[in-house]
UniProtKB/Swiss-Prot annotation:
Top-tier EC class: transferase
Name by which UniProt lists this protein: mRNA-capping enzyme small subunit
Transmembrane segments: none
Location of this chain's protein in the cell: Virion
GO cellular component: virion component
Domain of life: Viruses
Species of provenance: Swinepox virus (strain Kasza) (SWPV)
Keywords, alphabetical: Methyltransferase, mRNA capping, mRNA processing, S-adenosyl-L-methionine, Transferase, Virion
Catalyzed reactions: a 5'-end (5'-triphosphoguanosine)-ribonucleoside in mRNA + S-adenosyl-L-methionine = a 5'-end (N(7)-methyl 5'-triphosphoguanosine)-ribonucleoside in mRNA + S-adenosyl-L-homocysteine
Length: 287
């Protein structure tokens, strides 16, 4: 419990290793690889609680999260930490300290309004912006199309789970000599989003990677039609890297599981009111 409180109050970060050898790139657009136990069990352990929340009516979810859904200011926090004064995104041809892509559903928890679903057996889709590996699209590599003299490449990841997110980060670890992941205290601790900060470009591998990507896309420039699910590697990345990534993501998911458990217990509490012991614990933890 002390560890979870510390994670939420102080945030979590990790520096990932640099790999001089670029993995074998095999880009395919249109479909994400399915989740695999090889890439960590934390998602599967957490999914049952996410599904419990997913089937509850969204008006009720809004009520019980209204006071604990603080504005997500983690990107601004990272800018402050790194002394970034200017950023560019979406192809803007300006000089900046960083090129940025935000793939997260900022300040949003669910995708559409819906009523109660009576049991998890009737769930057909994930209506929450939580633990949804399909949210990661090829836009995660868009900053590379816009990169020129910027010191940093920053991506807000919508999720930390799935083969594709680990494969993507592994590729970035060969394109830049420094890759860090942050789950800031000022991010939402209801969602499994995080920030990747890459710096110190390794030009040799960037050139090889972008040549392959542009060949597959049949274009030198970014197109919005590229913003779809994708697969970037055929083979699994090495176990050493998976374990290093899981050091970070497991700490995030352990904290989220506790938060989600408190929220779910509050929403189904006997007194049918937002004034209950679970909500008080949740409020104390997140505010």
């Amino acid at each position: 419990m002390d560890k979870i409180t510390r994670n939420i109050r102080e945030g979590i970060h990790i520096l990932l290793p640099f790999y001089e050898n670029l993995p074998d790139i095999s880009l395919s657009l249109g479909k994400s690889p399915l989740p695999s136990l090889e890439y960590g069990t934390n998602y599967f352990l957490q999914l049952s609680r996410v599904n419990d929340l997913n089937r509850l009516p969204t008006d009720m979810l809004s009520l019980f999260t209204h006071d604990i859904m603080l504005p997500e200011t983690d990107m601004e926090k990272v800018y402050d930490i790194l002394n970034i004064k200017s950023v560019k995104s979406y192809g803007k041809s300006i000089k900046a300290d960083a090129v940025v892509a935000d793939l997260s559903a900022r300040n949003r928890l669910f995708k559409k309004d819906r009523e109660l679903i009576k049991s998890n057996n009737y769930l057909t889709d994930n209506n929450l912006y939580i633990s949804d590996y399909k949210m990661l699209t090829f836009e995660v590599f868009r900053p590379l199309f816009d990169l020129s003299s910027e010191k940093y490449c920053i991506v807000k990841l919508p999720t930390l789970f799935g083969k594709c997110v680990i494969d993507t980060i592994r590729v970035y670890c060969s394109l830049f000599k420094s890759v860090r992941l942050f789950k800031c205290a000022s991010d939402s601790w209801l969602k499994d989003s995080a920030i990747m900060v890459a710096s110190d470009i390794y030009k040799k591998n960037i050139d090889i990677f972008m040549s392959h990507i542009r060949s597959v896309l049949k274009s030198q420039y970014w197109k919005d039609s590229n913003n779809v699910q994708f697969s970037i590697l055929k083979e699994s990345v090495d176990k050493e890297f998976i374990n290093k990534f899981l050091e970070f993501s497991t700490s995030v998911y352990e904290s989220l599981y506790y938060v989600h458990s408190l929220l779910y217990s509050s929403m189904i509490s006997d007194n049918k009111s937002i004034e209950n012991e679970y909500q008080k614990k949740l409020t104390k933890l997140l505010l």
